[in-house]
A protein has these predicted regions:
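Surface-exposed repetitive/solenoidal architectures
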Residues: 26-221
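C-terminal segment of classical bacterial N-terminal signal peptides
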Residues: 15-25
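Terminal non-domain segments
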Residues: 7, 25-26
């Protein structure tokens, strides 16, 4: 009887631990789905040198422009004017379909905080006959020659990589970060605060008879 009770306790304990390590997100859909971001914000700010973000929908519009149209914001400053709660939907790492999207301007958090953000990866390649796969996860996919300053991600933010990738031959490029997954060129992070978690299962399963080169990197700024 004691042995049965002990086993039951152990099963319950392991179940609780599993929930703590790999909790399930409640969000449905992406911030980049039509209707979830403010298209008018893009039209109003297209020619502005300083682009002000005050709502989650405006924040999503900024990301959607990078993700869908490779709008890289060169010579522009994107500035928060309020705390932003991003808990309504998931944030797909903005890299666009060709993985050519990156941010090259100034992102000024102005001391404000992003909360409730759940980042999920963008993926490219990795089919049965494909010898290359790229997985990128972060608020920014890639920053290039950019400046990110006075930005806080609070403890309710998270980067989730819930999938195990089966990859048996070639090159796997895996970049996971919080504020940014990848930085290129002269990039500066100034007075940024990160309290976000990176939550992941084992991410790679390989075969026995093939060769793999795996690159894993990322920025927790």
């Amino acid at each position: 009887m004691k042995r049965i009770a002990y086993r039951f306790f152990l099963i319950v304990l392991l179940s609780v631990l599993a929930v703590e390590v790999f909790p399930v997100s409640a969000q449905e859909g992406s911030w980049f789905d039509e209707g979830n971001y403010d298209e008018e914000w893009l039209d109003k700010n297209f020619d502005n040198d300083v682009m002000i973000i005050s709502t989650p929908e405006e924040f999503a519009a900024w990301g959607a422009a990078m993700n869908r149209w490779s709008w890289n914001y060169p010579d522009k400053t994107v500035r928060l004017a309020a705390d932003i709660d991003m808990s309504a939907h998931k944030w797909i790492t903005p890299v666009n379909e060709q993985f050519g999207g990156y941010f090259s301007g100034v992102f000024d958090g102005d001391g404000y905080t992003i909360s409730g953000l759940t980042v999920v990866p963008a993926e490219e390649g990795g089919g049965y006959d494909d010898d290359y796969k790229r997985v990128v996860a972060g608020l920014f996919g890639t920053v290039r020659g950019a400046e990110i300053r006075d930005l806080t991600l609070d403890e309710t933010c998270r980067v989730e990589v819930p999938e195990m990738y089966s990859f048996y031959y070639g090159n796997l490029d895996l970049k996971i970060g919080t504020i940014a997954a990848s930085a290129e060129g002269d990039v500066r992070f100034i007075r940024c605060v990160n309290r976000a978690d990176i939550v992941t299962t084992p991410v790679l399963r390989t075969g026995d008879s093939h060769e793999i080169v795996c690159s894993v990197s990322g920025l927790v700024a």
